[in-house]
Amino acid sequence: MNDAFSTAQHRLDALGLRCPEPVMMVRKTVRQMAAGETLLIIADDPATTRDIPSFCEFMDHTLIASETTQTPYHYLIKKGL
């Protein structure tokens, strides 16, 4: 796993959840974070490989890193302003 993931300030376990639940949980968690804070998301739903990058782009957050070659998938996002 990428070392960047170990620096996350928040963590969200979305294992076992299916679309649209992972993105709904990410949205709820990010709302409670301050701008610039980071969130590690761990998921196993294949739809997250599309949904999480799209969510970040749409909501102006930064997808810092992702590992999607095998499950569980890992995403590190930084909350935008």
From Swiss-Prot:
Function description: Sulfur carrier protein which probably makes part of a sulfur-relay system.
Annotated organism of origin: Shewanella baltica (strain OS185)
Keywords, ordered alphabetically: Cytoplasm
Subcellular location: Cytoplasm
HAMAP family associated with the record: Thiourid_synth_A
Gene from which this protein is expressed: tusA
GO terms under biological process: tRNA wobble position uridine thiolation
Recorded GO CC terms: cytoplasm
Annotated family: Belongs to the sulfur carrier protein TusA family.
Gene Ontology molecular function: sulfur carrier activity
Protein name: Sulfur carrier protein TusA
Catalytic-site annotation from UniProt: C19 (cysteine persulfide intermediate)
